[in-house]
Each structure stands twice: as structure tokens, then as C-alpha cells.
A protein has these predicted regions:
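A compositional/biophysical signature of low hydrophobicity enriched in polar/charged and small residues
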Residues: 1-87
Length: 87
């Protein structure tokens, strides 16, 4: 049986000041999130997610991430092809 392909995406998250630790922890518990890291620059957190398809990805972003108190906005960059490094 063929393996079902997932969609991957990086989500850049802008948050309210002083909320980095709390929001990063909350995002890290969301279904499909593989990594969530505080970063410097225009956005405050970078997230990598895998989802079943674009509809599932959109649902997670809209209902699970954007609804977290302190999340101001998100920007999603869908991965063109998931390439594994063997780790």
C-alpha cells in the first residue's frame, strides 16, 4: 500500500510582548506540530507542522494557533516537498 503523503509548512507567528515562553509551549502541544522555537526578527516564533492536507493545515492554523491568546498574526509558508535527512 502506498504511503499517504503529508503536507508540511512553516508558520511564522507574531505575538504580544512578554508572552514568548507561554505561547511557544501552547503551540508545541497542538496536533501536528513538530517543532516550535522562539526566534528574533519580524516574527517571534517559528513552527514546523505536518498535516494530512491543505484543509487540515488551514483548520489547525485558524482554530488552534490563531485563537491562542496573545497571537497577533501568522504567516504560513507551505513546503514544496518534504525531504528527510535520515535523522
Amino acid at each position: 500500500m502506498a504511503e499517504k503523503r503529508k503536507i508540511g509548512a512553516y508558520i511564522l507567528v507574531k505575538i504580544a510582548p512578554g508572552k514568548s515562553r507561554v505561547i511557544t509551549d501552547q503551540i508545541g502541544k497542538v496536533e501536528g506540530i513538530k517543532t516550535a522555537h522562539p526566534v528574533t526578527g519580524m516574527f517571534d516564533i517559528i513552527v514546523f507542522i505536518e498535516a494530512a492536507d491543505i484543509n487540515h493545515l488551514t483548520d489547525i492554523v485558524r482554530t488552534k494557533i490563531q485563537t491562542i491568546e496573545g497571537v497577533l498574526r501568522t504567516h504560513t509558508a507551505i513546503v514544496g516537498e518534504l525531504v528527510t535527512t535520515g535523522d
